[in-house]
A protein has these predicted regions:
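Substrate-binding cleft of extracellular glycoside hydrolase catalytic domains
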Residues: 1-21, 25, 29-35, 50, ...
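Short acidic/polar active-site loop segments enriched in Thr and Asp
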Residues: 9-12, 85, 166-167
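Conserved beta-strand positions
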Residues: 16-22, 55-56, 89, 125-128, ...
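Noncatalytic carbohydrate-binding groove/subsite architecture in carbohydrate-active enzymes
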Residues: 30-154, 163
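Aromatic/acidic polysaccharide-binding cleft in carbohydrate-active enzymes
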Residues: 129-200, 210-215
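Carbohydrate-binding surface patches
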Residues: 211-246, 252
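C-terminal beta-strand-rich structural cap/linker in extracellular carbohydrate-active enzymes
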Residues: 256-274
Length: 274
C-alpha cells in the first residue's frame, strides 16, 4: 500500500512475484500466491486504477517446476476472478538451446492458459537471455555474441510478435559485461545491434499480421507509408516468394540485395522492401 501510494502513476505495471515456480524464490503454495496476487491487485487498483497488475512470473525450462506451479496458480487465479491484467513467463531456454526452444516454451505457456480457460490477456516475457548456465551441470554457460547474438535478438522479437507475446524484456542491459549472461547487452554488443535493427524495421510501424504456411512465416509491416515483409523459415530453410513490388532483401546487418523471384530463407528474419 505504501509503495503504490508513493509511486502511483510513476510505476505503470506491478509484477506480483518473480519466478514463483522456483522454490528459491517462492516456497508457499500456488494457491497462497494467488490469494496474495488478489490482495495486491485490490490495493494497487484502489490507489492507481490505471496501473497494470501482472501475474507472478513462471520459468519454463525446468519442466517439473513449471508443471507443479503454473496450472495450479492459474486455477487459483481463476477461482478468484482473474485479478490480473497480464500473465508473465521467463522464457529462458537451457544454456545449449536456441530461439527454437524459446518459441516452443511460448506454446507451453499458452496451452496452460487455454486449459485454464484464462481470459484473453496479454502475455509478457518479463526476463529473457540465452546461454545462461543450467539446468544442471550438463548445461554450462554458453557465449552468444556478434552476428549470432544480433540474429537471435531479431528472431526473438519477431517470434514474440508472431506468437502473441505482447512484451519482451531482455536481462539485462549493462555498461560492462555481466558474467552471468550468455548474451551480453552492452552498448556495442551484437545483441544491442539486434535491438537497433528491430527498432529500424518495426518501431513506429503499423503491424499488419503474419501468414504461416507451415514452412515460412511472413509478417507485413507499413512504416510511414513504406511497406515491407519480414519473413523467416520455421525449420532451418524454406522458400519464400515476396510480393512483386518488394525488390530488395535485407539481412539483419541491413545489407540488401536485389530479388526478382523466390528466395531461400533461413530461420533468421529477412526484410523485403521496395
Amino acid at each position: 500500500s505504501a509503495v503504490v501510494k508513493r509511486c502511483a502513476e510513476r510505476i505503470t505495471a506491478y509484477q506480483i512475484w518473480n519466478e514463483a515456480s522456483l522454490s528459491m524464490f517462492w516456497n508457499g503454495s500456488p494457491e497462497k500466491l494467488a490469494a496474495m496476487t488478489k490482495s495486491a491487485s485490490d490495493i494497487i487498483k484502489a490507489k492507481d486504477p490505471k496501473a497494470i497488475v501482472v501475474a507472478a512470473s513462471t520459468t519454463v525450462r525446468l519442466p517439473g517446476a513449471f508443471d507443479r506451479f503454473f496450472p495450479k496458480y492459474l486455477a487459483a487465479l481463476g477461482a478468484l476472478g482473474w485479478p490480473v491484467d497480464a500473465f508473465a513467463a521467463h522464457l529462458y531456454p537451457a544454456s545449449k538451446d536456441t530461439t527454437d526452444e524459446r518459441a516452443a516454451f511460448v506454446d507451453l505457456v499458452k496451452a496452460d492458459l487455454a486449459a485454464a480457460n484464462a481470459p484473453d490477456l496479454p502475455v509478457w516475457d518479463t526476463e529473457l537471455n540465452y546461454g545462461l548456465a543450467g539446468p544442471g551441470p550438463t548445461n554450462p554457460r554458453q557465449t552468444i555474441e556478434g552476428a549470432q547474438a544480433r540474429d537471435w535478438v531479431v528472431q526473438t522479437a519477431f517470434d514474440s510478435l508472431h506468437l502473441g507475446i505482447a512484451r519482451t524484456y531482455w536481462y539485462i542491459w549493462t555498461p560492462l559485461p555481466y558474467p552471468l549472461l550468455g548474451m551480453q547487452l552492452t552498448n556495442d554488443s551484437g545483441a544491442v545491434k539486434g535491438l537497433r535493427v528491430v527498432d529500424q524495421w518495426v518501431v513506429g510501424a503499423t503491424w499488419q499480421g503474419c501468414v504461416d504456411d507451415g514452412s515460412v512465416v511472413s509478417c507485413s509491416v507499413d512504416k510511414k507509408g513504406i511497406p515491407s515483409v519480414i519473413a523467416w523459415a520455421k525449420n532451418e530453410t524454406g522458400t519464400f516468394a515476396p510480393p512483386a513490388d518488394l525488390t530488395q532483401a535485407c539481412n539483419t546487418a541491413n545489407k540488401c540485395s536485389a530479388v526478382t523471384g523466390p528466395v531461400e530463407l533461413t530461420e533468421t528474419p529477412t526484410r523485403f522492401t521496395e
